[in-house]
Amino acid sequence: MLQTNNYSLVLLIQLALLTFDLFVNSFSELLRSAPVIQLVLFIIQDIGILFNVIIILLMMFNTYVFQVGLVSLLLERFRAMLILSALYLTLSICFHCWVMNLRWMESNRFVWTDGLQVLFVFQRIAAVLYYYFYKRTTEYLGDPRLYEDSPWLRDAFARARQ
């Protein structure tokens, strides 16, 4: 079971990773003259997104709902967040690779092609949705009812057995 002090630490780590992600999305263009630093920030950002997904999955695996075998209930509840996380990670990696490929040798050259601008917009929209759904999922996974036996869980288990 996730204890209150453990949940606070996990929540702090998740929010720190989300804040770093937001920081890189907001200010990475200011570092275009230093492509190595920008590359390192992009790599750390992608690893942070991956860590956030792993943390959410571990929190899901830790719930009583998962332990009694109602995985479908969790997947139904968190499907949007899991899909958005995968989409956001994919769009971020694609955007980072494309920008670094175009900008590596000539960092002050205008590299914003039409395709890159479209990818940029989709990546940023996915980022906003990812932040919202991730934070909502994190708060929902802090609900103590997910970590103990309860009447609604017994009803869900009975429906799943039929």
Swiss-Prot record:
One of its GO terms (cellular component) is vacuolar membrane. It is a multi-pass membrane protein. Pfam families: TMEM138. Its main location: membrane. The keyword Ligase does not apply. InterPro entries: TM_138 (IPR024133). GO terms for biological process: cilium assembly. It is found in: Vacuole membrane; Cell projection, Cilium. The chain crosses the membrane at residues 7-27, 39-59, 80-100, 110-130. Required for ciliogenesis. Belongs to the TMEM138 family. PANTHER family: TRANSMEMBRANE PROTEIN 138 (PTHR13306:SF6). This is Transmembrane protein 138. The lineage of its organism: Eukaryota, Metazoa, Chordata, Craniata, Vertebrata.
